[in-house]
């Protein structure tokens, strides 16, 4: 298929074909991605490694004067975005490491990696041969089995432990996911992985209906681990609202709104809180604490930015109209009160004027 496409489009190049060896290097054997690096080395300034089922959406622009040894690109799937290193300077000995969720590495170290920002994203569609025709939960359950075996061979590999927890979570094995995330959180290492592990522990405890103090404590632990991330506060606002505690929900929503979307983090940024969720939570409960103008502003901004799903439009519009009526009533009452006060002042002036004349 690739040869035919190249011929039809008159694209020059070389095609290498070999048996599948796994994604990355493991157990002393090179993986297929490493083999691809070896075949491509020196044949272009940079090499772009991309899965055949992924697609580039938006306006991607490669730097005009590239200087980094590798570039990290923004990925998106569902409600999450993350960064993955995919473009590599082709004069180094790059290789991939790991049986699953492999990562690139190179010698000699150190090497420079930059991010490519812009209005684009790589859509990770997971439509490869090993995923076609099976339920996603089954796919991730299989991944978990592979990672269980990998950990037996390499028990100190923190990346394996993290993605084992991820695979349990994505296959809806909540108890196993909770235990695996807890294990990963104790191993230290990359702060973002530790944060996300503790955050997901709170999510698992929520799904498993653990006592509220445990859930609350875990969300707060994740927030304390990385206070530059708003996701834990968003979840606390949402859960407090759902359980009839609007004042607490308001406080957490206000805190969450003060945290901008992180630009330096690379691991699984949950977009909903930053794009519209925090505003929505504030708009949903501001009336309960008498903050009608703030609720109106939140709903107005939501509607103007229009980042929420269509399924939420009717509810958000209803909240907006309700706030409009309340604020209009308050302003009208204030206007009437101001008129009454002005009239009182006029009457007082008249009385004082008469008293002054009588005194003379």
Language-model region placement:
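Structural motif corresponding to the intra-repeat A-B loop/turn of tetratricopeptide repeats
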Residues: 171, 208-209, 243, 289, ...
